[in-house]
Amino acid sequence: MVSSPTLRRIAVALERNPYEVVIGAGGLSRLGDELLKAGIQPGRRILVVSNPDVAAPYGEGCLQSLRQQGFHADLLVIDAGEERKTPATVAAIHDSAFEQRLERSSLMLALGGGVVGDMTGFAAATWLRGIQVIQVPTTLLAMVDAAIGGKTGVNHPGGKNLIGAFHQPSLVLIDPETLNTLPEREFRAGMAEVIKYGILGDPALFQCLEEGPEPNSAAGLGNSRLETILERSAAAKARVVAADEREGGLRAVLNYGHTFGHVVETLCGYGTWLHGEAVAIGMVAVGQLAVNRGSWTADEAGRQTQLIQRCGLPTAWPDLDPDAVLRTLQGDKKVKDGRLRFVLPMAIGRVEIRDDISRDEILHCLDQLRG
């Protein structure tokens, strides 16, 4: 087995089925080795699910690494835009699983961004009542957020991710070199989730992003700084997931910026904004809500907005009908007993969850955002 001393390892310390997030340049070539280290025995069948832009440069290398270690691997290529994140696409994955005769000992492996990871994870959760899944994210957003934690699912016309399941991966492998072929817009979208971790509990990470070269491309960050950002973000996500696997309480903080962000995605139409772009807009919106309540200072809200802009992300609220916004908010999956729950910033590095925000507060905030 090939030694891999350069790979960084982060434990997701779940009570049941703990796993590792493995980070390092060249990691994709050692994928088969890492499956063996994770206790996955050779001879098992693996359905690799990817999208065309990722499968072209990385699909064959992924299959080769798996086959060299004795796995029977096949590749399914699907369209993976946000508008394709539907039950119909999951059914296509199930069809391939049937054709490839995947058994309960078989695995699915997601090679791609957050949409591929979400759909592959959900397909694995529902095939034969659940088979193992491996996450190999190739976008920044998926690396720091979507691939870690076991949240899987697809969209419904009424809202984002309303159909889904918790299904933890057996391994997450992050190879930063795959970001070299990622379009810059998608890289910038992933930076929204990195900023989120700074707000949630890592002010040093937030300050790191404020300083030095503008963090709006992998090349601009440089290998060392990029791997540090990946490691700190993944570690932050792993800590929260380990403490609250199924979003019973603490894990809800990971939805910072997402409540308004999902409204933007839903009402503007899936695919109009990338997920991270919508989250960036949502963070600005919820920041304004917190300032209005007096729980956050205008100065720190301004720092957040400036950093979002520094990363090349949008901050302006789109022209949306306020009543449609309220209706969409009420359909959010985080609503509890009919009450909206928002993650509000209190300081850079500290947030709170509130369910006492009134309709009038939201409408006033929307008026301010529209300028």
Curated annotation (Swiss-Prot):
It is found in: Cytoplasm. Disulfide bonds: none annotated. Its EC number is 4.2.3.4. SUPFAM superfamilies: Dehydroquinate synthase-like (SSF56796). GO terms for biological process: amino acid biosynthetic process; aromatic amino acid family biosynthetic process; chorismate biosynthetic process. It is an enzyme of class 4 (lyase). GO terms for molecular function: 3-dehydroquinate synthase activity; metal ion binding; nucleotide binding. InterPro entries: Dehydroquinate_synthase, DHQ_synth_AroB, DHQ_synth_fam, DHQS/DOIS_N, DHQS_C. Its cofactor is NAD(+); Co(2+); Zn(2+). One of its GO terms (cellular component) is cytoplasm. Pathway: Metabolic intermediate biosynthesis; chorismate biosynthesis; chorismate from D-erythrose 4-phosphate and phosphoenolpyruvate: step 2/7. Its main location: cytoplasm. Binds 1 divalent metal cation per subunit. Can use either Co(2+) or Zn(2+). Pfam families: DHQ_synthase, DHQS_C. Keywords: Amino-acid biosynthesis, Aromatic amino acid biosynthesis, Cobalt, Cytoplasm, Lyase, Metal-binding, NAD, Nucleotide-binding, Zinc. NAD(+) binds at residues 114-118, 138-139, 151, 160, 178-181. HAMAP family: DHQ_synthase (MF_00110). PANTHER family: 3-DEHYDROQUINATE SYNTHASE (PTHR43622), 3-DEHYDROQUINATE SYNTHASE, CHLOROPLASTIC (PTHR43622:SF7). Catalyzes the conversion of 3-deoxy-D-arabino-heptulosonate 7-phosphate (DAHP) to dehydroquinate (DHQ). Belongs to the sugar phosphate cyclases superfamily. Dehydroquinate synthase family. This is 3-dehydroquinate synthase. It comes from Parasynechococcus marenigrum (strain WH8102).
